[in-house]
């Protein structure tokens, strides 16, 4: 386990795996995944916006969205295709008020790993958040 006394050392460490340099402003430490979800959802929740969540998926996203009056819309994952995103269900629920889409890769609870090609089909722009073990979340 690595212990950083300041965010500049953490930014330097994480930058070694990235094609760009992180600054201390890019880092927000939380006390685990639940708090991280709370922080992100609270920032995204604006009046009239919605968030797209996978079905099945981790229930904490919906619980946090509800606390902030953020409308939840669900898109399906297709078990017969390795739990890929159902592009048709996604297109039918996304609109100009969609503020975010949750993608968990590798997926929990299904265990699937989306390919770059599948994500490109979905027309997704992904921002990768790196946790303490450098896994993509």
Model-derived segments and their meaning:
Residues 1-12, 106:
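A structural motif shared across PLP-dependent enzymes of the aminotransferase-like
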Residues 7-50:
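Phosphate-binding glycine-rich loop
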Residues 43-65:
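Conserved PLP-anchoring active-site segment centered on the Schiff-base-forming lysine
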Residues 49-50, 71, 99-100:
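Structural signature of beta-strand start/N-cap positions in the alpha/beta core
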Residues 55, 74-80:
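Short beta->alpha connector loops at strand-helix junctions that form conserved
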Residues 67-73:
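A short helix-loop-beta submotif of the ANL/AMP-binding
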Residues 78-137:
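Active-site phosphate-binding strand-loop segment of PLP-dependent enzymes
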